[in-house]
Amino acid sequence: MKMLTSAAAAFTGLAAAAATPPVAVEWKAPETMPAKVARPFYGYLPNGDFLVAGGSAFVDGRKTWTDGVYVRRDGRWSSAGSLAALARLDGVSDGLCCETPQGVFCAGGTDGGKDLSSAFLLSLSGASGSPGPVLSAQPLPVLPEPVKMGAAACDGKRVYVVASKNVYALALAEPGEGWSKVAELPGAPREQHVAAIQNGDQKERLLVVYGGYEVASKMPLYDGVAICLSDVGAGETRAVAPLPPLVTTIGAAFLPSGHQHVLLVGGFGWHGWIDRACKGMSETDPVRLGWQRKVWAYNAVTDAWCAYGELAAGDSPRCGAAAGLRPGKTPESYEILLAGGETAPMRRTDAVSVASFRKVAKFASSAWIVVGLYALLMAAMAVYFIRKKKDENDYFRGGNRIPWYVAGMSIFATMLSSITFIAIPTQAYLADWRYFVMAFFIVGMAPVAIYYYLPFFCRLGITSAYEYLERRFNLGVRLFGSAAFVVFMVCRVAVVTLLPAIALNAVTGVSIDACILVCGVLTMVYCSLGGLEAVIWSDFVQGIVLMGGAVAVLVILILKTGPDGAHVSTFWNVATAQGKTTMFDFRFLLSQPVFWVVAVQGLVSNLSSYTSDQCVIQRYIATPDENATKRSLWFNGGMSVLAQVVFYSIGTALYTHYRTNPAAMDVTMPKADSVLPLFMAVELPPWLAGLVIAAVFAATISTLSANLSSASTALVTDFLKRFRPSMSGRAQIRSGQACTYLVGVLGICAALALSRMESSALFDNFNKYIAMLTAGLTGLFFMGIFLPRVKGGAAILGLVANYAVCFGCEAAGCDVFGVRFHPFLLGGLGLVACIVVSLLASFVVREKGRDLSGLTLRTLAKGANSGRAKASGPAAST
């Protein structure tokens, strides 16, 4: 193994090296604010203004509590009134505050005589005619207990207050309901702790609380506590990684950054606090070893700390400063701000430090060359197939001459796509291997498709899978099924286009919108001109590139984990110790992704893909005969399971790499789905980064082209050709090209809309909606083959029941009659509802009998005609 890893390192040009942060903190020219205060209320307002209110100051050596309110807008500070006028507070400091979508939440603190329990929301009033910002204060319910030097955080809907021992929550939309107790911190009461809300391991939403000091002993605390805020497990607490050695949170700020990081800025050093608070030193004495200059970063997913820069040279470290982090679309548009605070005991400052992030690693020109060469290869293939003389049979059915291994690789590339390349590693990085159970059904469904479904598609001479539905049921069922498939394709095009756009944006900085447009338009042109044969052969090439790039990434990730000679052992030990290899969870729970829940999703989604998805069925009918199709299905099954192993391993390796090298991750990473693309951009050799990005786009193009080709075939065959039987072959091709552009444009628009939505895990949402949208189609084909008594009217009633159950339960938040279940069960519930309602309706709805010869399992001539029947769709026309 050691020789193997050494050879791999030599091949890739990699050696074990210290991780370099992909972005650096870059400080700008200092500013000054109108007052010298420490421990005020502070935060960014929704419009980007920074607010400072109240705080303590020293006047002639005497500590005072102030009520001034100041706002920074576009680098300039101005007065915005007083807390006395806004909130009837003559002076307050040591309060707790956080940013909310409505304004800055402020609560508690002290006025020098007593601890306070008041709470209010400071926001811009919208008044006009004033030269400066105009603020208003919205009163909120008083805290359950007086709190000073506590912490607060907001998840967008609720404000959480962490007092000395208890954690409380208030719903911003319904403040009249008051505060509710969420959890209790372990250990003795504490003060000067910090808190932030961030995305954690196992895709949980966490309230992370760190440090402070014991109220009684004044001894600093280094522990961390994570409180689960997710619907499942809400209020549960667990210990997380302690603070770095000799680092405290006393007087520090805790600022969420990106998708999963929190930055710790400012505060006392350990020796400074011990000298001042625990050894009885006078406040007039200087702090012996100074305060914290470093900026520390905590990753809530990998549960690891690292140093991530420090204050600018010549800038004094400070405690109790007003601090904020305003996110941006790029690292350079982020803003970190430290205003005021104390630089020594009894010494306040009006200094303001402002910083942003600077991207250190960039996509090299050599990487672009590799991507360009790959694009030229695809263009050459497109030109070749465009120049080939083709009729409608070539365009829609590939001329029935595609070799079985090419068709198998095409099915493999179509079913995996960029969703596999980006979303599955993200899933394994954020959670574990529980979703891998779905991969077993890729192979498990292959014999079902081969022995029970494939004969119908191969022997009926159909071009669209939904032609079978008209023969078996009626025209209405065919049209409904085809329309549902096209809608699903639009949704799939959106997700498949968005994922590589996220990748390219993370790697190059090109906007996500531009990436979506380029990828979508190029694929539309390629697919519309080349037809099915071009799509399948490009799938073959892209599938090879996809797997080659994936294996290279996995090898390099493991090489970058742990010391020389211990890469594999470190990878395995860290993964198992942190529970990242968990696959089988046999608890009987409906609300968690346990084995039974994931198995239902795997069964429904793969049964749908093999039996009712035109993308896959189109490849069945592109081979010369039924036996070739069978071989292609077995080939796809083996390749798919191998690919799942590789991509889940990549996700696990990403976790072990960033847990052992926390400084290597970008603290500004906006989405979890960017984790693999960012690794490619920062840590792969340029030529390999180009190859892997090409692989991502290979996956995208293969799936998009398959989606567009199959959707256009369905539209032409089931709608245009069905109602205009006399359409010429040339007219069918032109119509197919137009439909390709139509579906492509709709998918691109959906991708642009989806990119503006908050989504922590696209893979979960994709799996949920694929089951919801296709469960009814799966039920139709199942009933058509296995339940001969179900006819058209009953089948339509079953479809209505399927969508009512799926979308009704989803609208109810997967909580029906007090029973909460995981979204992965929606497809299974819909499928069962479709079959049961149709079967029951068949006893009530009277319908005229149809000739079912060759259309059900009972009437199919076993072993007869394993070749191809003449096409009845577009390809049949001359």
Give the positions of each predicted feature.
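Kelch-like beta-propeller repeat domains
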Residues: A19-F363
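Membrane-embedded helix-loop-helix hairpins and adjacent transmembrane boundary segments
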Residues: F357-T878
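Sec-dependent signal peptide recognition
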Residues: M1-A10
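Sequence-pattern detector for short linear motifs
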Residues: T5, Y42, G75, H193, ...
